[in-house]
């Protein structure tokens, strides 16, 4: 009986791990490794090729290449040398020698620069020879074009990631803050009213509304309420008056009830009804306040959660990297806008963006609106100019006339005497331009 050698017995091949995959089981119950080693065709590659950068390249003669290939072939698979495997290695070496004789002496590097090999200077002692390098012209030979490309790259990198500092703050909801504000922008128009709704009121006018809001700003400051409460109060007043006719003597009651509802929605500690009666000089009773509260909620269909300018102010101030001074000036300008009836023609997001833009111009003394602010507000400087010029006009006359509640509020030490800052009058220079 003929004894079979272990090298031809598949069961004698011990299972071992090879780079490139897991061991596979053969038909005889043993392990085969043919698909788990590197392909033999990838071993005998032409190693004479250009470097990825300009340098002196040496070439090897055929004898050195055979030594390298044989060494790699011996080390690569780490498998037993069977008769079939040895024959395959010998055949691949022979085919490699034939390809080397017919190979083209011109190779290209990764960047397209040609590298010429001079075969006439080949040394019989198998000494390495340098290869000549042909330089090509650069792609951008014009310095002006290169400068324009560089400036475009710099401008593309000006948008800052304003949420990276809050990555570890779970309350900042960095993961979906952009989606949240996109939703605010989508529904903000639901809280807007017609800028001509006062024409439908029989006993009210724009001046009466301004007096009411100016008084409520002082009440809001005396009660030391949160800033968002004031914005929601004015929003509830306008939305209610746009749907319900109110007589003049009930207008102050509408303002008190709107502030009461805003406090219940925003504040932790809500003013009691008796305090509201007291500040109204007892013009209304407890019953009047409760009845008006029911009427207002039914008229608004209990829809209280609509974005106001305050929601956008916090985000836009963060985009502007505002300090305390810039923040106070921005809120001073937006509070002045609450009093003015004509500002109802602008959506809350635009009012907030214009307040931040005008505040930056006021503090710096020149026009300032960078790419980061434009990206996060979705408003360009040209889109904000109309609203900003109106705010500058409100700032100029803030301390004059009878409605000076906002000026007195921001002229105190509590608000760092912000009302005393000079308005950005240079923005009004564009008023008469087309």
From Swiss-Prot:
Name the record gives this protein: G2/mitotic-specific cyclin-2
Signal peptide region: none
Keywords: Cell cycle, Cell division, Cyclin, Mitosis
InterPro entries given in the database record: Cyclin, Cyclin-like_dom, Cyclin-like_sf, Cyclin_A/B-like, Cyclin_C-dom, Cyclin_N, Cyclins_cyclin-box
Assembly and oligomerization: Interacts with the CDC2 protein kinase to form a serine/threonine kinase holoenzyme complex also known as maturation promoting factor (MPF). The cyclin subunit imparts substrate specificity to the complex.
Entry keyword annotation includes Cell cycle: yes
Parts forming coiled coils: none
